[in-house]
Regions:
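Gly/Gly-Pro- and Ser/Thr-rich, intrinsically disordered tail segments characteristic of DNA damage-repair
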Residues: 1-225, 234-235, 364-420
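Short, charged/polar surface micro-motifs in flexible loops or helix N-caps
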Residues: 10, 33-36, 293-296, 348-352
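Short Gly/Ser/Thr- and Asp/Glu-enriched loop/turn motifs at secondary-structure junctions
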Residues: 98-102, 139-142, 281-285, 336-340
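Short, hydrophobic beta-strand segments
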Residues: 103-108, 304-311, 354-360
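Short, charged/polar, Gly/Pro-enriched secondary-structure boundary elements
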Residues: 111-115, 297, 349-356
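DNA-contacting surface of Y-family translesion DNA polymerases
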Residues: 189-337, 353, 419
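C-terminal hydrophobic structural anchor segments
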Residues: 325-380
Length: 420
């Protein structure tokens, strides 16, 4: 059996842990530069606030309903996530981190009769140890466990855990579960399935195996089998290497000068390269994109991207930053105000499988030692202590007017408790 621990409204819940007076009050968390909503409490959802809702469109609601608004505080959220995972790993044989607010639990070998109470015990313990409310879904496969965790969120009477393993119970749930909410059903397949009158997960599993394989390939067939209780997605104690690494930011205001955008893109390339090295990988493609503010329809609109390739796959910041600059030069156009830029590293492979080029002019062993030294220095003394000159020395400016304290990672911002 597999479990799925899903933190409820995670970013909003993190803010509430240190502000208990916000319990019962609408809470939203905004994206970088306070652009749009990326997390909502249940009270905020009830007001009709959507994911991705531009902040300026909800300011009237904010005043009328006393919404607590927060800028994204990823240092806090990352640390709270680590605390949740640490707690989980003390109670189950293994936990696989799936995202910042989700983890799969290995429950194989535990008696079925104990699972529901174990799930509730996990939910209570995580809440007590971290302050974060979680929903535990338990089922024979990862895909069904994801569905069970969604049910747990919808029905408070389940008391933090939903066990779903009997065929009749699974059928009852799948008959009502929308196909677009099934884990593993992407946007392209979603449209195709709906056009074929596949509205629910039950409609999906009733289709013949050949029909699924012909239209959705091996990935779709795996989901089809998982929904029928056949485990096809292995448990991974260590997270797999990412196949794409993206770093992007919205700017606090529109940028018009190439030099300003170049500095930001260089910083993005440096951050992406560090993430690449952290997972012991190399990339064979670098894509840079820039776009204007789509919410300012009165302004000229422009979006473009460009992909370039290194001579050989690399994780070297000193190669990736110039490649990103080359891509940016090809797509930058004067006369536009750019609101966002980003970089994506793709065609990712393992560092151990590198095929060297006999005529490669780069001393890769020397550069690898340099990158290791730079990463070690930044880990020890703080991010961006050592940087490439192209990214400048000033930190990236972001508009974060509603930023909370870093209660758990900065001694200067640690919470103060007063007692009479």
């Amino acid at each position: 059996m597999y479990g799925l621990c899903d933190c409820n409204n995670f970013f909003a819940s993190c803010e509430r842990v240190f502000r208990p007076e916000l319990e019962g009050r609408p809470v939203v968390v905004l994206s970088n530069n306070d652009g749009c909503v990326i997390a909502r409490s249940n009270e905020a959802k009830a007001l009709g606030i959507r994911m991705g809702h531009p902040y300026f469109q909800i300011r009237d609601l904010e005043k009328r309903h006393g919404i607590a608004v927060f800028s994204s505080n990823f240092n806090l959220y990352g640390d709270m996530s680590r605390r949740v995972i640490w707690t989980l790993r003390r109670m189950v044989p293994a936990a696989e981190v799936y995202s910042i607010d989700e983890a799969f639990l290995d429950l194989r070998g535990i008696e079925t009769g104990r699972l529901e109470e174990l799930g509730r015990h996990i939910s209570r313990t995580v809440r007590r140890n971290t302050g974060i409310p979680v929903s535990i879904g338990i089922a024979p496969t990862k895909t069904l466990a994801k569905i069970a965790s969604k049910l747990c969120k919808e029905y408070p009477k389940l008391q933090g855990a939903c066990l779903m393993y009997r065929p009749q119970d699974i059928e009852k749930v799948l008959r009502k579960f929308p196909i677009e909410d099934v884990w593993g059903i992407g946007r392209k397949h979603r449209r195709m399935l709906q056009a074929a009158s596949v509205r629910t997960a039950w409609d999906f599993v009733q289709r013949p195996e050949a029909w699924i394989r012909g239209r959705m390939g091996v990935t779709g067939l795996r989901t089809w089998k998982e929904l029928q209780g056949e485990a096809c997605i292995d448990f991974e104690s260590a997270p797999p290497a990412k196949q794409q690494i993206t770093v992007s930011r919205s700017f606090a205001h529109e940028l018009t000068q190439y030099e300003e955008i170049h500095t930001s893109v260089a910083a993005f390339a440096s951050m992406a390269a560090e993430k690449l090295r952290r997972q012991q990988s190399l990339c064979g493609e670098v894509t840079v994109y820039i776009l204007t503010n789509r919410h300012r329809e009165e302004l000229p609109q422009y979006f473009e991207s460009q992909t370039v390739r290194p001579v050989v796959p690399t994780d070297n910041t000193l190669e990736l930053v110039p490649l990103a600059a080359k891509a940016l030069q090809r797509i930058f156009r004067k006369g536009y105000g750019y609101k966002k830029a980003g970089i994506t590293l793709s065609d990712i492979s393992s560092r151990t499988g590198l095929q060297t080029d006999l005529f490669d002019p780069v001393d890769r062993a020397r550069h690898a030692r340099l990158m290791d030294a730079m990463d070690a220095t930044n880990r020890t003394y703080g991010r961006n202590r050592v940087v490439v000159a192209a990214q400048g020395f000033a930190p990236l400016k972001m508009n974060r007017q509603h930023l909370s304290q870093e209660y758990t990672t900065d001694w200067k911002q640690i919470i103060t408790v007063k007692a009479d």
